[in-house]
Amino acid sequence: MISSNDFRPGVSIVLDGSVWRVLEFLHVKPGKGSAFVRTKLKNVQSGSVMEKTFRAGETVPQATLEKSTMQHTYKEGDEFVFMDMETYEEGRLTRTQIGDRVKYLKEGMEAEVIKWGDQVLGVELPKSVVLEIVQTDPGLKGDTATGGSKPATLETGAIVMVPLFISQGERIKVDTQEDKYISRE
């Protein structure tokens, strides 16, 4: 159990049988009446966001989330097969369990799999990954680093905007959280 006074961004709680992550909180002490905590919560499973007010000192169950490092070994049909790096057990995850970051997932890549009990809530990829460009328009003579950008398709199928001087076959570093080009490799 966790007190509403101990809420911080990133804390996970259980409400109505679902896991919610605290995005924002504000402890309010009005001049008249008792104090309360106004929060903005995000459902970890569905992604929906809601605002909820708790009485100051009210206790709610805290969600115990487990993170385990797993390696993506291969894709079979619509499922992605992961191997636990400690126990060498295999687990299968669907595209919806992984989320929209699946476009950066490459065979052999390690990721943090987040579980609540036996239920997989999501997958955290590394902040940046190095991938090869398989298709992009060729750069023209005179293109500079500040000249603009063009779309490039990566080996995983993801499309990111890259500077005009980047060409097909090059390896680039991409920010997986903001879908942005970082640098050449």
Swiss-Prot record:
SMART domains on file: EFP, Elong-fact-P_C
Single Gene Ontology BP annotation: peptide biosynthetic process
Keyword entries, A-Z: Cytoplasm, Elongation factor, Protein biosynthesis
Pathway entry: Protein biosynthesis; polypeptide chain elongation
Cell compartments where the protein resides: Cytoplasm
Disulfide bonds: none
Gene3D superfamilies per UniProt: 2.30.30.30, Nucleic acid-binding proteins
Protein name as it appears in the record: Elongation factor P
Biological source species: Nostoc punctiforme (strain ATCC 29133 / PCC 73102)
Organism ancestry: Bacteria, Bacillati, Cyanobacteriota, Cyanophyceae, Nostocales
